[in-house]
Amino acid sequence: MNINKIALIYNKNSKHLAIIEEIKKLYNYCKIEEAEVIIIIGGDGELLHNIHRYMHLNIPFYGLNLGSLGFLMNPLDTKKLLQNIYESTVSILHPLLMQVEDTSGQIYKALAINEVSIFRKTNQVAKFRIDVNGVERMSELVADGALVATPAGSSAYNLSAGGPILPLASNMLCLTPICSFRPRRWHGALLLSTDTIKFEILNITKRPVNATADFQEFNNITRVTVKSTKDKYIKLLFNKNHTLEDRIIKEQFGE
């Protein structure tokens, strides 16, 4: 991938400003809107926030890890930065579209790259009904919550909640309960990326529920609809010897 214009995005309060300044001295950079590649310096959180902010530009993102985990990032190598981008592989991610309705009847929409999650707002467990493609699949799930994860997000919150890791090209979604109380032995479901999942919240007054799309949170929700978007996509760049597919496979074997 040949590039001439790069943009740099980083947290100006980062403790790694010395490294960031070194990168700025080594490479010419331009305004974000003029870039051929947007380089996000930091961790997964910094990357996700800026993907949400700039995905409408349809410019590829390259994450440079200065955080802790950095699952969606590339290892720091200031000297070979442009070479690594030239030789990088592209992963195409389709975000989830979440539509929620709250107790006032207000409807909100948000995109999620990793997962959509719904969870109890108080000490009372949540109760909700689950429909898939308009068909009731579970009349009542009693749990702390539930989530729908993309393949890219399946190794994040979904994995911590006991859900499976999905291969990036699987065209599937994870539906995973969070601390399920009833049915106690239900561990979730694997669904097609073309499926539409709907959660109807039960006993809302006593058991209020919130919903999030990645880091965007909505309060006092009555229903949530989740589906994958095909008309929106994100291009993430990864070093040729450090692809997202390889990382997902390694994660399944505990590497």
Curated annotation (Swiss-Prot):
Record-annotated active site: D44
Keywords: ATP-binding, Cytoplasm, Kinase, NAD, NADP, Nucleotide-binding, Transferase
UniProt subcellular location: Cytoplasm
Entry keyword Transport: no
Cofactor: a divalent metal cation
Alphabetized GO MF terms: ATP binding; metal ion binding; NAD binding; NAD+ kinase activity
Any one Gene Ontology cellular component term annotated for this protein: cytoplasm
One family name in Pfam for this protein: NAD_kinase
InterPro entries recorded: ATP-NAD_kinase_N, ATP-NAD_kinase_PpnK-typ_C, NAD/diacylglycerol_kinase_sf, NADK
GO biological process: NAD metabolic process; NADP biosynthetic process
Catalytic reactions on record: NAD(+) + ATP = ADP + NADP(+) + H(+)
EC number: 2.7.1.23
Residues in coiled coil: none
Binding residue positions for NAD(+): D44, G45, H49, N114, E115, D144, A152, S155, A156, Y157, N158, L159, S160, Q216
Cited function: Involved in the regulation of the intracellular balance of NAD and NADP, and is a key enzyme in the biosynthesis of NADP. Catalyzes specifically the phosphorylation on 2'-hydroxyl of the adenosine moiety of NAD to yield NADP.
Family, as annotated: Belongs to the NAD kinase family.
HAMAP family attached to this UniProt entry: NAD_kinase
Protein name: NAD kinase
Organism encoding this protein: Rickettsia prowazekii (strain Madrid E)
Lineage, top ranks: Bacteria, Pseudomonadati, Pseudomonadota, Alphaproteobacteria, Rickettsiales
